[in-house]
Amino acid sequence: MSTQTTKSNSRSLIIVDDKIPYIKGALEPFAEVLYLPGEELTAAIVRDADALITRTRTICSAELLEGSAVKFIASATIGFDHIDAAYCRRQGIAWANAPGCNAGSVNQYLASALLTYARKKRIKLRDLTIGIVGVGNVGRKAADLCHAIGMRVLLDDPPRQRAEGRGNFTSLARIREQADIITFHVPVQCAGEFATHHMVDNGFFKDLKKCPLLVNTCRGEVFDSGAVKNALDSGSISGLIIDCWENEPEIDLEMLEKTDLGTAHIAGYSRDGKAVGTMMSIRAVSRFFKLGI
């Protein structure tokens, strides 16, 4: 691709994923702006860019950024798995995502999914205990929703508990013992004290005391797909609602067939969520470059 990205004056050059909605015209008074398909960005194209505004389609790693002028990356998404944070830190490249931008949309999806499941099973949600794993932007809204329904709510968030004290938090072990429904709202952390990659594995199911419904609207890699399928086959769990899958877009079709509700990572896909993500990205770029937007 021979797109010209060389700056013609002293203004910053910002390359923007052309699928990000509601952004055209917002930055042009303050910077040179180039709109391109995010999946087509290459090292040659971004070489002279000062900033990127991306979605998850653009893998921001050494392969793309090495030798470039990029100083800042804004992702108009909650997720930031596509940004190599360690590489950016070493190279002095700042970045920002858009946490909570679509939390309301995910919460609406969760409400619809739970009500659909309850009607299908002819059960009353207010008679059940729900465990919420991850009590951030989405998890907090989920807790408010479930309290409003009349459910008993158990909250597990080790990082928040470490920072804030025990408060209303409990342990994942207690959730595994008492919850009729367990819903996950955590980022993917592959290592460290608070690792979440494959936190739902064979060991997770061995400690269950009930036969809960599992819900995943966060990240596919939080679930070990093989372990989840085994749990469904053995009756260790009563059902599965899943919006986020391992190895997207090459999802496990066998697991899809076993779900009570399976969707294509659309829980947070809404106009208002996209608009807020765009706004947060513009503000992040403005703060970094002192544009005054």
Can you describe what each PLM-predicted range is?
Residues 10-11, 126-129, 202, 211:
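Phosphate-coordination loops involved in phosphoryl transfer and adenosine-cofactor binding
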Residues 21, 148-165:
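NAD(P)-binding Rossmann-fold cofactor-contacting core
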Residues 1-49, 154:
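N-terminal glycine-/charge-rich "phosphate-binding" loop or analogous flexible N-terminal tail
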Residues 107-123, 148-151, 279-287, 292:
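Oxidoreductase and adenylate-handling cofactor-binding alpha/beta cores
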Residues 97-101, 105, 190, 248-293:
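C-terminal helix-to-coil terminal segments
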Residues 59-61, 160-253:
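Rossmann-like adenosine-cofactor binding region
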Residues 50-122:
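Phosphate/diphosphate ligand-binding glycine-rich loop within oxidoreductases
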Residues 99, 107, 126-147:
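Glycine-rich adenosine-cofactor-binding loop
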